[in-house]
Regions:
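Short capping motifs at secondary-structure boundaries
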Residues: 74, 89-98, 188
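GGW-centered surface loops in extracellular recognition modules
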Residues: 36-44
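Functional-site microenvironments in short loops/helix caps that host divalent-cation chemistry
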Residues: 30-32, 44-45, 51, 55-56, ...
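Bacterial Sec-dependent N-terminal signal peptides
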Residues: 1-32
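C-terminal, low-complexity/hydrophilic appendages and adjacent surface loops
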Residues: 59-64
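Short, solvent-exposed alpha-helical surface patches in non-cytosolic proteins
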Residues: 78-79, 83-90, 177-183, 199
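Short beta-strand-to-coil "C-cap" segments at the C-terminal boundary of structured domains/repeats
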Residues: 343-350
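A short N-terminal beta-strand-loop micro-motif at the entrance of redox/enzyme domains
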Residues: 67-74
Length: 352
């Protein structure tokens, strides 16, 4: 909802030396050819050390400084949560998603700049954000050109009136807010991954740009469900999908996880802080849980949660969200057509 009200969507010498020494220590410890332990649709992700963030030519400012992180072992869903799985949750609990509820203006205005006028009642309705391709080239900094706030849109009706998830039960569920994913996680007795867990899992234990390696997404056979062609008006459909794809349609990463790039953005548990990585500039992060509070200098009144992995809309011209280190954020009460989630479980230490 807030995305519609406002227009969206150096490492110093000492820290650089610290990073170099850490990398030299762990670069030869890439996790390769591990046996894939799978249980109840989840893959065991081993503990490991890696360099979180990026400094390459496509990296955004919030991806730096690159810093060393250790993550304990955990279980992670092999795929994104599907419509079939989410329907089981709805049938069992009667839960009503954010997109199916009318926004509460009194709560909404607390996270907007002071004196923001109340929007027209036509906006204060049960709705979600839907992608609409444009007729031609547009300003890629103006996300509102291709995102439309529409009523009667939800996980059941991903494109609104006349659409359905019939014959798409193996597609990732979408129009899911962060709060919705939390409700599902509680029911499933799992949790959302931390941002660090997510990036380690996406890397597959190897130091590569993408979950599949370093080859550009546009080279060779399709590697993920992303936007091929000219965004947001011409998709060549090289990967055969305009919107979501059935989970597992592309090759898994070295850990055996599917769709860690493209298809849908995935919620993480962390608040989004634009400057969060700076707190690890000269020290290792040990199972970081994210910042205590959100911070975005460009949207200072908005409380946002981290999303990872990119979506079917990602294209190098403006997004490249399918890079392992790429970060995105959104309001936790906002549903979007390109956003879903997957869950994790902690591995309990054996009793002594």
């Amino acid at each position: 909802m807030k995305l519609e009200i406002f227009k969206n969507l150096q490492i110093n010498l000492l820290s650089g030396l610290f990073i170099f020494l850490f990398f030299a220590k762990c670069a030869n410890k890439e996790v390769k050819n591990l046996p894939k332990v799978i249980k109840d649709g989840m893959v065991m992700i081993p503990s490991g050390d890696f360099l979180m963030g990026s400094s390459d030519e496509q990296a955004r400012d919030d991806e730096s400084p690159v810093h060393p992180v250790h993550v304990n072992a955990f279980w992670m869903d092999k795929t994104e949560v599907t419509n079939f799985q989410f329907k089981k949750f709805i049938d069992a609990t009667g839960y009503i998603t954010t997109a199916e509820r009318k926004p509460d203006w009194e709560e909404l205005k607390k996270e907007l700049p002071p004196n923001t006028p109340k929007p027209n009642d036509s906006l204060l309705k049960a709705a979600s954000l839907v992608f609409e391709a444009t007729d031609g080239p547009v300003n890629l900094n103006d996300y509102g050109v291709w995102w439309q706030w529409k009523s009667k849109v939800s996980w059941r009706y991903p494109k609104g009136k006349g659409s359905s998830i019939e014959n798409k039960m193996d597609h990732p569920v979408v129009h899911i807010s962060w709060y919705d994913s939390q409700a599902y996680a509680a029911w499933a007795e799992k949790r959302l991954p931390t941002e660090a867990e997510w990036e380690w899992a996406a890397s597959g234990g190897v130091n590569k740009k993408y979950p599949w390696g370093d080859e550009a997404v546009t080279n060779g056979e399709p590697k993920a469900n992303a936007w091929e062609g000219s965004f947001p008006y011409k998709n060549t459909l090289k990967d055969q999908f305009f919107y979501t794809a059935p989970v597992g349609s592309f090759k898994p990463n070295p850990f055996g996880l599917f769709d860690m790039a493209g298809n849908v953005w995935e919620w993480c548990s962390d608040w989004y802080d634009y400057t969060y990585y700076e707190s690890f500039e000269s020290q290792r992060g040990n199972n970081p849980q994210g910042p205590e509070a959100p911070y975005d200098p460009y949207q200072p009144y908005l409380r946002q949660k981290v999303m990872r992995g990119g979506s079917f809309l990602c294209n190098d011209a403006y997004c490249s969200g399918y890079r392992v280190a790429s970060r995105m954020k959104s309001s936790p009460d906002t549903g979007l057509q390109h956003t879903g989630f997957r869950l994790v479980k902690s591995i309990e230490s054996p009793s002594k």
